[in-house]
């Protein structure tokens, strides 16, 4: 009985810890990052350069930018690299 209780406590602690560890892409080369506390979304967004041209940026965020080419999501590695 004590072993079962100890097992349940350990599993609960591990699950609570994993619940706050969203992983997002953070570069065009596929670099990944575990997001810090408070950053609950992954984002891929377009940064305008000059008329008709832009590049993409990736990040962990708490709020996403609006835009036709932007992706905002909340699961691991959901802001895919093209």
From Swiss-Prot:
Residues 1-21 form the signal peptide. Transmembrane segments: none annotated. The keyword Magnesium does not apply. The keyword Membrane does not apply. Disulfide bonds join 24-42, 35-60, 64-72, 73-78. InterPro entries: Snake_toxin-like_sf (IPR045860). GO terms for cellular component: extracellular region. GO terms for molecular function: toxin activity. Keywords: Disulfide bond, Secreted, Signal, Toxin. It is found in: Secreted. Expressed by the venom gland. It comes from the Eukaryota. This is Three-finger toxin MALT0063C. It comes from Micrurus altirostris (Uruguayan coral snake).
